[in-house]
């Protein structure tokens, strides 16, 4: 892996958790732009190989950037915690479309709910994914 490459963990509804190398992602004018930022929903094209745990990211485009989350410390903290929880409770290459939808939904929720409801939403998310 070169010094302009970036190791990224993606979570997809079809493939589950994937570790990929984004070649050239650390360059100032990277083709990936904000698509590899934390808490960004995107459309990714990867070269998957059955004999490897580390795959190659060919392209990635932003579908939804959660800019409200990134500007608000409390919302960002809970969004990061939700992503971390999914990362820790999943293994690579295990598809779980329901979990993907729950994660995407809670990130949208963190952007839309009132400040007083953020913690309750996080607890609800934990209960939903534990089911």
What are these regions (language model features)?
Residues 1-7, 11-131:
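Non-catalytic alpha-helical scaffolds and adjoining flexible linkers that form interface surfaces
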């Amino acid at each position: 892996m070169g010094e302009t490459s970036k190791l990224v963990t993606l979570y997809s509804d079809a493939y589950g958790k994937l570790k990929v190398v984004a070649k050239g992602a650390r360059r100032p004018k990277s083709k990936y732009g904000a698509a590899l930022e934390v808490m960004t929903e995107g459309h990714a094209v990867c070269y998957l190989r059955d004999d490897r745990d580390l795959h190659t990211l060919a392209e990635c485009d932003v579908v939804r950037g959660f800019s409200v989350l990134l500007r608000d410390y409390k919302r960002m903290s809970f969004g990061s915690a939700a992503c971390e929880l999914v990362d820790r409770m999943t293994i690579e290459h295990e598809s779980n479309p329901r979990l993907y939808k729950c994660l995407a939904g809670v990130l949208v929720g963190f952007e839309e709910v009132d400040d007083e409801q953020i913690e309750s939403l996080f607890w609800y998310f934990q209960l939903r994914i534990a089911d």
